[in-house]
A protein has these predicted regions:
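Surface-exposed, low-hydrophobicity beta-strand/loop segments enriched in small/polar/acidic residues
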Residues: 1-139
């Protein structure tokens, strides 16, 4: 059975603190921007470099912790659109919103690394810098 969205599968935790640009729930997929020494985190959107997953609910304009991703880190994520199956492993997927991914290959936001073989709405993914032609890199 799949673990909750945002559960780390591979790689060490890298806890960072950021200022929430909007209200965030625990486990939200976030992107990051830095300006004048302040790191601001917001819900992730497709075609951006993903910063990590929130470790707690964070009110808008408040600071909170998130698990920062690094190259090679893998996480369980919720598949919001599409049906996870063995043929999807090794393919790319796109961020749908802060709560999950869609099994399309338009922006190539993450690579599907595995699944539990049963649960069709969860996958193990490795987030990478988007491989689309014109990525907007915010992290």
């Amino acid at each position: 059975m799949a673990r909750p969205h945002g559960t780390r599968v591979l790689g060490e935790r890298h806890i960072r603190t950021g200022l929430a640009g909007s209200a965030l729930a625990k486990g939200d997929l976030v992107q990051s921007t830095e300006a004048t020494g302040t790191e601001t985190i917001n819900n992730a959107a497709t075609n951006v470099a993903v910063a990590g997953f929130t470790l707690e609910a964070i009110s808008s304009a408040a600071t909170g912790d998130y698990d920062r991703m690094r190259s090679g880190d893998q996480f369980w994520v919720y598949v919001t659109t599409g049906t996870m199956q063995a043929s999807e492993v090794g393919k790319f997927c796109d961020i749908n919103n802060e709560l999950g991914v869609t099994l399309t290959e338009s922006n190539n936001d993450a690579r599907i690394m595995g699944w539990d073989g049963v649960t069709t709405n969860f996958a193990i993914v490795e987030f990478t810098t988007p491989e689309s032609a014109t990525p907007t890199v915010l992290a």
